[in-house]
UniProtKB/Swiss-Prot annotation:
It comes from Xanthomonas oryzae pv. oryzae (strain MAFF 311018). It comes from the Bacteria. Its EC number is 3.1.3.77. PANTHER family: ENOLASE-PHOSPHATASE E1 (PTHR20371:SF1). The gene is mtnC. It holds the Pfam family Hydrolase. Pathway: Amino-acid biosynthesis; L-methionine biosynthesis via salvage pathway; L-methionine from S-methyl-5-thio-alpha-D-ribose 1-phosphate: step 3/6; Amino-acid biosynthesis; L-methionine biosynthesis via salvage pathway; L-methionine from S-methyl-5-thio-alpha-D-ribose 1-phosphate: step 4/6. Binds 1 Mg(2+) ion per subunit. CDD domains: HAD_EP. NCBIfam families: enolase-ppase, HAD-SF-IA-v1. This is Enolase-phosphatase E1. Belongs to the HAD-like hydrolase superfamily. MasA/MtnC family. Its cofactor is Mg(2+). One of its GO terms (biological process) is L-methionine salvage from methylthioadenosine.
Length: 232
C-alpha cells in the first residue's frame, strides 16, 4: 500500500473494542439518563437535543417519555444524532469523575502516534458525537491522544453507510478521496467510502470478530487484524 495523504478512522471495533462501548459506555448512559435529563433538562443545549427526540417521535410529550424513548434507542443501538449528543454529555461527566477511561487498542495508539509523527493527518469519523469522540481520545487508557487528530466527523456530516458522507469529508479536509485511507470494522461503511474512490482497510480484530467474515463479503477491501499490519 502506498502512503496516503490522510487517514480517516472509525472508533468502535477499529481503534477500540466493541465490548467497551456495548458493555461500559452504553449501560452507563442508560442508567444516568433519567437523572441527567431531570437535572439538566432546562439547559438550552440539552433541551435542544430533547426537542429533536420529541420531533422524531412526533408528539408533544413529557420528559419521562423522552427518557424512556432514549433508553429504548440505547438498547437498539440507534444512530440518532440527538441520542449520540446526549450520551456524549453524560459520558463527559463520567470521564471527569474517572468512572472509566476509554479503551484503546495498544497497536492503534502506537500506530496513530507514529503516523502523526510521520506527518500524515489523522481524522475520526464515528456515529458518536464529535464532543464524545474528543472525550474518548482525551481520556483513553493510553493517555490523551486527542492532539493527534486534525478534525472530527459524526452523523451531522451524514450516514456512515452513504457515499455522499465521505465525499463531504474529503471536501472538508481538502484531500482527494483517492488519497484518503478509511479504516473501519463495518463492511457497509467501507463499501460506501470505496464508492467515492477512497482506499479502505477492514479491521477484523479477533477480540471483536472471532469468526472471520467471508471473502465474498469483504470483497476488495484490505483485511487486517490490527493497525501494525497497515504498512506504507
Amino acid at each position: 500500500m502506498t502512503r496516503p495523504q490522510a487517514i480517516l478512522t472509525d472508533i468502535e471495533g477499529t481503534t477500540s473494542s466493541i465490548s467497551f462501548v456495548k458493555d461500559v459506555l452504553f449501560p452507563y448512559a442508560r442508567r444516568a439518563m433519567p437523572a441527567y435529563v431531570r437535572e439538566h433538562g432546562n439547559h438550552p443545549q440539552v433541551r435542544h437535543w430533547l426537542n429533536q427526540v420529541a420531533d422524531e417521535i412526533g408528539e408533544d410529550v413529557p420528559d419521562d417519555v423522552l427518557i424512556t424513548t432514549l433508553q429504548t434507542w440505547i438498547d437498539e443501538d440507534r444512530k440518532h444524532t440527538a441520542l449520540k449528543a446526549l450520551q456524549g454529555l453524560i459520558w463527559g461527566d463520567g470521564y471527569k469523575i474517572a468512572d472509566f477511561t476509554a479503551h484503546m487498542y495498544a497497536d492503534a495508539a502506537l500506530q496513530l502516534q507514529a503516523w502523526h509523527a510521520a506527518g500524515i493527518p489523522l481524522y475520526v469519523y464515528s456515529s458518536g458525537s464529535v464532543p464524545a469522540q474528543k472525550l474518548f481520545f482525551a481520556h483513553s487508557d493510553a493517555g490523551d491522544l486527542s492532539g493527534l487528530v486534525s478534525d472530527w466527523f459524526d452523523t451531522e456530516v451524514g450516514s456512515k453507510r452513504e457515499a455522499a458522507s465521505y465525499r463531504r469529508i474529503a471536501e472538508r479536509i481538502g484531500v482527494p478521496a483517492s488519497e484518503i485511507l478509511f479504516l473501519s470494522d463495518v463492511i457497509e461503511e467501507l463499501d460506501a467510502a470505496k464508492r467515492t474512490g477512497m482506499r479502505t482497510a477492514l479491521l477484523e480484530r479477533r477480540e471483536d470478530y472471532p469468526t472471520p467474515r467471508s471473502a465474498d463479503d469483504v470483497g476488495s477491501h484490505q483485511r487486517v487484524e490490527n493497525f501494525s499490519q497497515l504498512v506504507f
